[in-house]
Amino acid sequence: MSRYTVFMCVLGALGASVCDASALTLDEAYASVSLSPPTTRMVIVCHDFGCAQRTPVGLGAGDHATLSSLLAPGRASAEAERKAVAAAAAWFDRRVGPEAGTTRRVARATGLGGQSTVGQMDCIDTSRNSTSLLLILEQLHLLRHHKVEGPEARGFVLDGRGPHATAVLTDIHTGKQWAVDSWTHKYGERPDVIPLDVWKQQS
């Protein structure tokens, strides 16, 4: 099994999330936070920062049909598939939000300045949830041009940038990696899907 970078968050004294990265297998990554990997029938949604709260959401035939419809335009090319993935991610956020209590999720939630973490998501939550969605798409055989990778991180205190994590896809034709980052957008909006090397240079 391939190695990947997994991120765990703890709440700091000021309420900000502090991210630590370590190389783990996919199984180890989910086990490290006592989280079951997604299946086509069930996904556990992380929220309230650092996956402090987990809400199981059942998925059925109707959900599978919706995802299939959303990914259908992506069959044409890798670029089209990335656009379709973004549309699926926005739908997924709206699908699980009412059950997880995250319908008022804001963009770039930090927990600083007294900001409540209830119903919000930090980058650990969004990167893990996005990775779970991507794995579901893979399990449903809806990804033709990409494979799912583990989350990647950028930034740490010493380089002056706050830690941040994102879900990742690899274009199977070119090997180019792409960030799928929903933390930068509020509830129900499409995530950024940009080259991972570009994402890593951002702050």
Give names to the regions the model predicted.
Residues M1-Y4:
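Positively charged n-region of N-terminal signal peptides that target proteins for export
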Residues F7-S17:
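Bacterial N-terminal signal peptides
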Residues A21-A23:
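Boundary at the C-terminal end of the N-terminal hydrophobic targeting segment
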Residues H47-E79, R105-S116:
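Acidic/histidine-rich, surface-exposed loop or edge segments in extracytoplasmic proteins
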Residues E81-H146:
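Mid-length scaffold segments of soluble, non-membrane domains
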Residues L135-W199:
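Hydrophobic/aromatic-rich core segments of domains that either
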